[in-house]
């Protein structure tokens, strides 16, 4: 992967720019490609090496119960990302996966691979900064489908949250704070179409109930 794309400072660049929109795409494709390479390598082992590898593989067990939201990005990178990676590989082999390291699928395209192959774009949404008495702006940014799942899943469930996130066209947010450290957020979201926007709205209504 490092021979295809310069990975030496990709995370540092995102951190310096405070823009992690490309992280889900790169992480998912990197992990999917690594899994495929490992599977190919293991498929060429003889029976002796297979048995030896199985006997030397540690049996890790985690006795710690983590909050549900901890697993949300891992589901995207390893589960949904793995499925997208396999579909890309089946259509264009490793060359197509290498190309995906440049194209970098959006979080929505990872959740819904057909949107990757149709090259459905993420739409940048302008949001107005409000003049709020006693409040000042502290941060702003863009919303992707992973953000929606983060917000919604623990309340309304994985399937409904992901279905809503698949319909996201784009979005932006602005955070405000006052002297009492009260936070206020404004969000502007665009759906892929009216029906998708209504589905996102319904998901937020269920989340708020």
Residue ranges and their predicted role:
Residues 59-181, 185-188:
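Pan-zinc metallopeptidase signature
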Residues 180-209:
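C-terminal soluble interaction/assembly domains
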Residues 44-50, 95, 195-197, 208:
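Substrate-binding/catalytic groove segments of enzymes
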Residues 38-42, 89, 208:
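Hydrophobic residues within well-ordered, non-membrane alpha-helices that form the packing/core
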Residues 7-14, 49, 53-56, 97-100, ...:
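Generic structural signal of hydrophobic/aromatic residues within well-ordered alpha-helices
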Residues 2-54:
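Post-HExxH zinc-binding segment in Zn-dependent metallohydrolases
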